[in-house]
Protein backbone atom coordinates (compact mmCIF):
# COMPACT_ATOMS: atom_id res chain seq x y z
CA UNK A 1 0.00 0.00 0.00
CA UNK A 2 1.35 3.42 -0.93
CA UNK A 3 1.37 6.39 1.39
CA UNK A 4 0.72 9.97 0.43
CA UNK A 5 3.84 12.07 -0.06
CA UNK A 6 4.05 14.98 2.37
CA UNK A 7 6.73 17.62 1.80
CA UNK A 8 8.88 18.66 4.73
CA UNK A 9 10.05 22.29 5.03
CA UNK A 10 13.74 21.36 5.01
CA UNK A 11 13.55 19.33 1.80
CA UNK A 12 12.15 22.03 -0.46
CA UNK A 13 14.36 23.58 -3.13
CA UNK A 14 13.25 27.07 -4.06
CA UNK A 15 13.81 28.70 -7.43
CA UNK A 16 13.70 32.37 -8.38
CA UNK A 17 11.57 33.47 -11.34
CA UNK A 18 11.38 36.82 -13.15
CA UNK A 19 8.04 37.74 -14.74
CA UNK A 20 7.67 40.70 -17.11
CA UNK A 21 4.23 42.27 -16.58
CA UNK A 22 4.21 44.33 -19.79
CA UNK A 23 0.73 44.26 -21.41
CA UNK A 24 -0.53 41.38 -19.25
CA UNK A 25 -3.95 41.75 -17.57
CA UNK A 26 -3.68 42.18 -13.79
CA UNK A 27 -5.91 39.27 -12.78
CA UNK A 28 -4.29 36.75 -15.10
CA UNK A 29 -0.82 37.78 -13.94
CA UNK A 30 -1.87 37.57 -10.29
CA UNK A 31 -3.44 34.12 -10.57
CA UNK A 32 -0.34 32.61 -12.20
CA UNK A 33 2.00 34.28 -9.69
CA UNK A 34 -0.14 33.19 -6.71
CA UNK A 35 -0.04 29.61 -7.96
CA UNK A 36 3.77 29.71 -8.18
CA UNK A 37 4.06 31.32 -4.73
CA UNK A 38 1.93 28.51 -3.25
CA UNK A 39 3.94 25.83 -5.05
CA UNK A 40 1.02 24.38 -6.99
CA UNK A 41 3.23 24.01 -10.07
CA UNK A 42 5.39 21.41 -8.28
CA UNK A 43 4.61 17.70 -7.93
CA UNK A 44 5.51 17.80 -4.21
CA UNK A 45 2.81 20.40 -3.39
CA UNK A 46 1.49 20.00 0.13
CA UNK A 47 -1.34 22.34 1.21
CA UNK A 48 -0.06 22.93 4.75
CA UNK A 49 3.63 23.48 3.85
CA UNK A 50 5.16 26.45 2.07
CA UNK A 51 6.50 24.73 -1.07
CA UNK A 52 6.45 27.77 -3.37
CA UNK A 53 9.16 29.64 -5.24
CA UNK A 54 10.28 33.27 -5.18
CA UNK A 55 8.80 35.51 -7.88
CA UNK A 56 10.12 38.87 -9.10
CA UNK A 57 7.69 40.96 -11.14
CA UNK A 58 9.22 43.74 -13.25
CA UNK A 59 7.51 46.45 -15.32
CA UNK A 60 4.49 46.55 -13.01
CA UNK A 61 3.73 50.05 -14.28
CA UNK A 62 3.11 48.63 -17.78
CA UNK A 63 0.50 46.03 -16.89
CA UNK A 64 -3.00 46.25 -18.30
CA UNK A 65 -6.32 46.90 -16.58
CA UNK A 66 -9.11 45.66 -18.84
CA UNK A 67 -12.58 47.13 -19.16
CA UNK A 68 -13.48 49.98 -16.83
CA UNK A 69 -11.45 48.69 -13.89
CA UNK A 70 -9.16 51.72 -13.96
CA UNK A 71 -12.06 53.91 -12.89
CA UNK A 72 -14.51 51.48 -11.23
CA UNK A 73 -12.37 49.07 -9.18
CA UNK A 74 -11.90 50.36 -5.64
CA UNK A 75 -9.69 48.93 -2.90
CA UNK A 76 -11.02 49.60 0.62
CA UNK A 77 -9.22 49.50 3.96
CA UNK A 78 -10.06 50.81 7.42
CA UNK A 79 -7.88 52.61 9.96
CA UNK A 80 -9.84 51.08 12.90
CA UNK A 81 -10.94 54.54 14.03
CA UNK A 82 -14.49 55.90 13.69
CA UNK A 83 -15.00 57.23 10.17
CA UNK A 84 -11.71 55.69 9.06
CA UNK A 85 -12.84 53.92 5.88
CA UNK A 86 -10.28 54.67 3.17
CA UNK A 87 -10.36 53.80 -0.50
CA UNK A 88 -8.01 53.79 -3.46
CA UNK A 89 -9.04 53.60 -7.12
CA UNK A 90 -7.17 51.04 -9.24
CA UNK A 91 -6.26 53.55 -11.97
CA UNK A 92 -4.74 55.93 -9.43
CA UNK A 93 -2.78 53.08 -7.84
CA UNK A 94 -1.45 52.01 -11.24
CA UNK A 95 -0.24 55.55 -11.87
CA UNK A 96 1.13 56.32 -8.37
CA UNK A 97 2.26 52.97 -6.94
CA UNK A 98 1.90 50.05 -9.39
CA UNK A 99 3.80 47.67 -7.10
CA UNK A 100 1.11 48.00 -4.42
CA UNK A 101 -1.63 47.30 -6.98
CA UNK A 102 0.01 43.99 -7.92
CA UNK A 103 0.65 43.14 -4.27
CA UNK A 104 -3.02 43.74 -3.37
CA UNK A 105 -4.16 41.51 -6.19
CA UNK A 106 -1.78 38.63 -5.45
CA UNK A 107 -2.30 38.80 -1.67
CA UNK A 108 -6.04 38.28 -2.05
CA UNK A 109 -5.37 35.08 -4.02
CA UNK A 110 -3.27 33.52 -1.24
CA UNK A 111 -4.54 31.90 2.00
CA UNK A 112 -5.48 34.63 4.47
CA UNK A 113 -6.70 32.92 7.64
CA UNK A 114 -3.32 31.59 8.76
CA UNK A 115 0.38 32.45 8.74
CA UNK A 116 1.10 30.28 5.70
CA UNK A 117 -0.30 32.91 3.33
CA UNK A 118 1.94 35.56 4.87
CA UNK A 119 5.02 33.35 4.44
CA UNK A 120 4.12 32.80 0.80
CA UNK A 121 3.45 36.50 0.23
CA UNK A 122 6.92 37.44 1.51
CA UNK A 123 8.44 35.64 -1.49
CA UNK A 124 6.86 38.15 -3.90
CA UNK A 125 9.04 41.05 -5.07
CA UNK A 126 7.40 43.68 -7.30
CA UNK A 127 9.19 46.53 -9.12
CA UNK A 128 7.65 49.24 -11.29
CA UNK A 129 10.59 49.39 -13.71
CA UNK A 130 13.03 47.04 -15.42
CA UNK A 131 15.67 46.99 -12.66
CA UNK A 132 15.67 44.66 -9.66
CA UNK A 133 18.35 43.97 -7.02
CA UNK A 134 18.07 40.15 -7.12
CA UNK A 135 20.62 39.32 -9.82
CA UNK A 136 22.77 37.38 -7.33
CA UNK A 137 20.01 34.76 -7.02
CA UNK A 138 20.25 34.05 -10.79
CA UNK A 139 16.50 34.14 -11.46
CA UNK A 140 15.20 32.43 -14.56
CA UNK A 141 12.84 34.26 -16.90
CA UNK A 142 9.31 32.86 -16.82
CA UNK A 143 7.16 33.57 -19.87
CA UNK A 144 3.60 33.40 -18.56
CA UNK A 145 1.94 34.18 -21.89
CA UNK A 146 1.58 30.44 -22.51
CA UNK A 147 0.23 29.86 -18.97
CA UNK A 148 -2.66 32.33 -19.21
Curated annotation (Swiss-Prot):
<dbReference type="InterPro" id="IPR005822">
    <property type="entry name" value="Ribosomal_uL13"/>
</dbReference>
<keyword id="KW-0689">Ribosomal protein</keyword>
<dbReference type="GO" id="GO:0003735">
    <property type="term" value="F:structural constituent of ribosome"/>
</dbReference>
<dbReference type="GO" id="GO:0017148">
    <property type="term" value="P:negative regulation of translation"/>
</dbReference>
<dbReference type="GO" id="GO:0003729">
    <property type="term" value="F:mRNA binding"/>
</dbReference>
<dbReference type="Pfam" id="PF00572">
    <property type="entry name" value="Ribosomal_L13"/>
</dbReference>
<dbReference type="InterPro" id="IPR036899">
    <property type="entry name" value="Ribosomal_uL13_sf"/>
</dbReference>
<dbReference type="InterPro" id="IPR023563">
    <property type="entry name" value="Ribosomal_uL13_CS"/>
</dbReference>
<protein>
    <recommendedName>
        <fullName>Large ribosomal subunit protein uL13</fullName>
    </recommendedName>
</protein>
<keyword id="KW-0687">Ribonucleoprotein</keyword>
<comment type="similarity">
    <text>Belongs to the universal ribosomal protein uL13 family.</text>
</comment>
<comment type="function">
    <text>This protein is one of the early assembly proteins of the 50S ribosomal subunit, although it is not seen to bind rRNA by itself. It is important during the early stages of 50S assembly.</text>
</comment>
<dbReference type="GO" id="GO:0022625">
    <property type="term" value="C:cytosolic large ribosomal subunit"/>
</dbReference>
<dbReference type="GO" id="GO:0006412">
    <property type="term" value="P:translation"/>
</dbReference>
<dbReference type="InterPro" id="IPR005823">
    <property type="entry name" value="Ribosomal_uL13_bac-type"/>
</dbReference>
<comment type="subunit">
    <text>Part of the 50S ribosomal subunit.</text>
</comment>
